[in-house]
Amino acid sequence: MRCSAVSLGSGTIINAIATGFGSAFGVDLKIKADVELVDNGKKIINGISIDNPTLKPSLVERCVKNVLNYFEVDYSAKISTNGDIPIKSGLSSSSAASNAAVLATIGALGEKVDSDLVLDLAIKSSFEEKLTVTGAYDDATASYFGGITVCNNMERKILKKDEFKEDIKVIVLMPEFEKNVDVNRMKLIKDYVDMAFEKCIAGDYYKALFLNGLLYSSALNFPSNISVDALEAGAITAGLSGTGPSYVALCYSEDEKNVENALKKYGNTVITKPSTNGARILY
């Protein structure tokens, strides 16, 4: 009983921590999960990250365990993950890993794939591993479905699905700043994040992303000038991704090199593009 599945990384448009409402978009970077099940009644689950062997496999092991418990089987399992989403890049590698792990386990069991079940079990696993504050339903759905999702994270509802109408690039900056997840400070900017979310729900994703980035970078003491530097170099929009320290900038292909040069003085960069091809079983 084997199965392989992939799920996307995602970038932030609106961080949901302040208000419970968020938005994210799928990017063309993926994590693949390979699951092998053994019907031996022992419930032994072992995981490994092929591309990053030092990474603890506890999240994907938890995903497999939760799927097996849901379907009330006592199989053992091996799970390996491999992908091109940089860890701690602000591109929702944990959402991608958990989605892929759950999907591959369901596939290995030969059960019917139900999107709501995949997302629920993936988010449950992330909560249990203390990897999320809000459940990150926006990140999880953008990773799973691709495109843009606008969500009520508290109720786990997708309010709107969309996609970028233009052919654009995504440049991710990964500076060596110390991560800061001060929930109390993020709650202070709630009313202003609401204003950015209004732009988002109206379909003005570029302005929403930029405003969100300014607000959260201010609350978390990350430099806001980085986003402005990206605009100066030709980016359409730019802002903090998630709770940082990474930033994302969106630009047209002809401005890609200028924007990357403006950002890479702050740290490593990765260039990708939005994706509407969501999670899927490979074989």
From Swiss-Prot:
GO terms for biological process: amino acid biosynthetic process; aromatic amino acid family biosynthetic process; chorismate biosynthetic process. Its EC number is 2.7.1.71. PANTHER family: HOMOSERINE/4-DIPHOSPHOCYTIDYL-2-C-METHYL-D-ERYTHRITOL KINASE, SHIKIMATE KINASE. It comes from Methanococcus maripaludis (strain C6 / ATCC BAA-1332). This is Shikimate kinase. Keywords: Amino-acid biosynthesis, Aromatic amino acid biosynthesis, ATP-binding, Cytoplasm, Kinase, Nucleotide-binding, Transferase. Coiled coil: none annotated. Pathway: Metabolic intermediate biosynthesis; chorismate biosynthesis; chorismate from D-erythrose 4-phosphate and phosphoenolpyruvate: step 5/7. It is found in: Cytoplasm. GO terms for cellular component: cytoplasm.
